C-alpha cells in the first residue's frame, strides 16, 4: 500500500507539540509493515534549512496556484533517512524558509498552510507518487481532503483520504473572503466550509474526508459531546 502523510510538524525535524511526536512514530511504524511504501511531507522551515543534520536534495520545482496567486515550491528529499520512510519538504522562502521563531503564530498562518496543503498534492503528482491513502492532520492540512475531492480527483482517482484530529480546539477559522481569496475552491464547496458565516477548514475536512479519526478512542468518544467538540459535535 502506498501511504502519503502530510503534516505541519514532525520530529526530529520540527516539533511544537504532540503532533510532532506522532509524526515521528507513525510513518516509521507503517513503513515496517511489509508491502507499505510511506511518504512523509513537511514544510521546509528555517530551523530545518539551517540544520546540517538534515541534508536534502532538490528533486522537483513547481508553481502552486493558490486562488489568484502563484507561488514557487521546491520539493526537497531528505538524503539520510534509512528506515523505509521517504521524507519530502516543501520549500518556499516566503511562507517558511525566511520565518524565524515558532512554527505557528504568524498572522498569515491560514494562507501558509493552505499553500502547504495544495503543494502536498502537487508534489505527490510531480514525483509520481500516487497514494492509495493520504493521511492529513489537524487544521493545518485540513484543506487537503477538500482539495482532493474538488480539484484533484482526476490526478488521484483512487486515493482515499483519512483526516486525523489531534486538537479540535484549533479549527482553522478564517473570514468568509478566505474561501475565494486564498483557497480558490469551486463555488459549490462554499457551504462545506461555511460555519457561522466564516470559513472553517476543519469542518470542510470532516465533511469531505473518507475517514475521520482521532489520536485515541477516548478522545473520539469525548468529541461526541458539545463540551469537548468546540462546536463541531453536530458535524462529527
Q: What would you call each of these model-derived segments?
A:
Residues 1-236:
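Catalytic cores of nucleotide-sugar-dependent glycosyltransferases that transfer UDP/GDP/TDP-activated
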Amino acid at each position: 500500500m502506498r501511504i502519503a502523510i502530510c503534516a505541519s510538524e514532525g520530529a526530529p525535524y520540527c516539533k511544537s507539540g504532540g503532533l510532532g511526536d506522532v509524526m515521528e512514530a507513525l510513518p516509521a511504524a507503517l513503513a515496517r509493515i511489509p508491502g507499505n511504501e510511506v511518504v512523509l511531507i513537511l514544510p521546509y522551515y528555517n530551523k530545518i534549512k539551517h540544520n546540517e543534520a538534515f541534508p536534502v536534495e532538490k528533486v522537483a520545482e513547481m508553481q502552486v496556484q493558490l486562488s489568484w496567486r502563484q507561488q514557487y515550491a521546491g520539493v526537497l528529499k531528505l538524503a539520510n533517512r534509512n528506515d523505509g520512510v521517504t521524507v519530502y519538504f516543501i520549500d518556499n522562502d516566503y511562507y517558511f524558509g525566511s520565518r524565524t521563531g515558532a512554527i505557528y503564530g504568524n498572522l498569515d498562518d491560514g494562507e501558509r498552510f493552505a499553500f502547504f496543503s495544495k503543494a502536498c498534492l502537487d508534489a505527490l503528482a510531480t514525483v509520481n507518487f500516487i497514494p492509495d491513502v493520504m493521511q492529513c492532520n489537524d487544521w493545518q492540512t485540513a484543506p487537503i481532503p477538500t482539495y482532493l475531492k474538488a480539484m484533484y480527483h482526476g490526478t488521484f482517482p483512487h486515493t482515499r483520504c483519512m483526516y486525523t484530529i489531534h486538537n479540535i480546539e484549533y479549527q482553522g477559522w478564517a473570514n468568509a473572503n478566505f474561501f475565494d481569496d486564498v483557497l480558490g475552491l469551486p463555488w459549490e464547496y462554499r457551504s462545506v466550509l461555511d460555519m457561522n458565516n466564516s470559513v472553517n477548514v476543519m469542518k470542510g475536512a470532516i465533511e469531505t474526508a473518507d475517514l475521520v479519526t482521532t489520536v485515541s478512542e477516548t478522545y473520539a468518544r469525548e468529541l461526541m459531546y458539545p463540551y469537548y467538540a468546540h462546536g463541531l459535535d453536530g458535524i462529527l
